[in-house]
C-alpha cells in the first residue's frame, strides 16, 4: 500500500516539475505576431493553426440546433385547446314574460311606454275584442229570458200542485236585466197556460159529474126493477097456486109470468148499464188525472231543457266575461317592459307578442346553435368563451360561461343545415370599456360561443395533416 502511494506521489511530482519548467519559458513558446500578409503566405496547415476559422458560424449552428430542440420539447409539452364554435344570441331566461292577446282585438288604450318600470298588476293595455261587447250583451239578454222561462215553469209546477195560481214575483236580483215587456209577457203566459189547463180539467170534471148523475139514475132504476121483479114474482107464485086450485085461468098466469120476465130483463139491462157507467167514470177520472200528468210532464221537460240552456248560457257568459277580463292586460311581474305595439286603434292578432316583461332577478343567457359536426364533442358543464359581435373582444373583452343545457333533437336551419339548440350561462351581463365604464348587455345581441371540448399537444396538431395523409395513402378508389 505504501509503495502504491509513493508511486502516485512521484507521478504527480514529475508532472509538477515539467509544468514548472514550461511555465518559465511560456513567453518563448508563443507564436510570433505576424501581419495578415505574412499569415497568407504561410503553408496551409500553418495558416489554419495561426488563423483558425471563426467560431460565429458554429455558434449560430449550435443556436439553431438548440432552438429546434427547444421547439420540439415545447411542442411535446405544450397543449392547445380544442374548441367548437357556435353562433347565437343573448336572451333572457325563461322567466321573462311575453304578453300576448288570446284573440284578434283593437288597441283601445296604452298605459305604459317602452322601457318603463312597471309594478305587478299594473295596467298595461286595454284591448277591445272584435264583437265581444255585442256577444256579452246578447248572452246576458238570452240568459235573462231563460231565467224568466225557468221561473215560469216553476210557478206552473207550484200551481198544479196547489191547484191554484200563486203570487207571481219578478223582483228578484236574477231578473234585474229583464225588461218590463219580458216580465209582462211571462205573467201573461203563466196565467194563460194555467187557465188553459184549468179549462181542460173543468171540462173533464163536468163529464165526470154527468157520469156520476147517470150512475145515480141507473142505480135508481135498478132499485126500482129489483122491487118490481120481487112483486111480480110474488104475484106469479100466487097465480100459480090459484091456477093449481082451478081458481084462475092459464092465460092470467102466462100474462103475469111475462110481466115478471120483463121486470127481470129490465133489471139485467140496468145492471149492465151500471157497469158501463162505472167504466166511463173510471175513464173520466183517469182523463182528469192524465190531463194533469201530461201538463206536468210537459212543464218538467221544458224546465229540464230550460235548465240545460241556462247552464250553457251561463258558461257562455262566463266565457265572454273572461274575454273582457283578458282584454285588460296587467303586468304579471314587476320590472322593465319592452313595448312592441304603439298604435291606439291598431289591430293585434292572436298570439302576437305585444310586450316582454323581464323580472328584476332575470338573468341573461346565450342561446347558441351547435353544428352537427360538433355536437358529439360537447357536454353539459364545459367552459365557453362568449364574444359579443357588437363589441370587439380586443377592446371590450369577452364573457366566460358554461354549457347549461343541450337539446339532442336536431332542427333544420336554412344556412347551417341540421343544428342543435343549446343554452350557455354567462358569468356577468356587462362588458368593461377602455374608459372603465360598464356596458350593459341586452337581449338579442349576436354572439359567438367558443366551447372548449378538450386539449391536444402542439406536436400532435402539427403532425395531424401528415398523419391524415399517411392514413389515407396506399389506397385505391
UniProtKB/Swiss-Prot annotation:
Localization of this protein: Cell inner membrane
Phenotype upon changing residue 113 to Q: In strain: S 4074 / Serotype 1 and Isolate CVI 13261 / Serotype 9
Gene Ontology BP terms: killing of cells of another organism; protein secretion
GO CC aspect terms: plasma membrane
Consequence recorded when altering residue 94 to D: In strain: S 4074 / Serotype 1 and Isolate CVI 13261 / Serotype 9
Bilayer disposition of the protein: Single-pass membrane protein
Superkingdom field: Bacteria
Topological region Periplasmic: 81-477
Cytoplasmic side stretches: 1-59
Impact after mutating residue 14 to R: In strain: S 4074 / Serotype 1 and Isolate CVI 13261 / Serotype 9
Keywords associated with the record: Cell inner membrane, Cell membrane, Cytolysis, Hemolysis, Membrane, Transmembrane, Transmembrane helix, Transport
Pfam families reported in the protein's UniProt record: HlyD_3
Cited InterPro entries: MFP (IPR050739), Secretion_HlyD_CS (IPR006144), T1SS_HlyD (IPR010129)
Statement: the UniProt record of this protein carries the keyword Transmembrane: yes
Residue intervals passing through the bilayer: 60-80
Signal peptide: none
Stored NCBIfam families: type_I_hlyD
Other comments on record: The sequence shown is that of serotype 5.
Biological function: Involved in the transport of the toxin RTX-I as well as that of RTX-II.
Family membership noted in the UniProt record: Belongs to the membrane fusion protein (MFP) (TC 8.A.1) family.
The protein's name in its UniProt record: RTX-I toxin determinant D
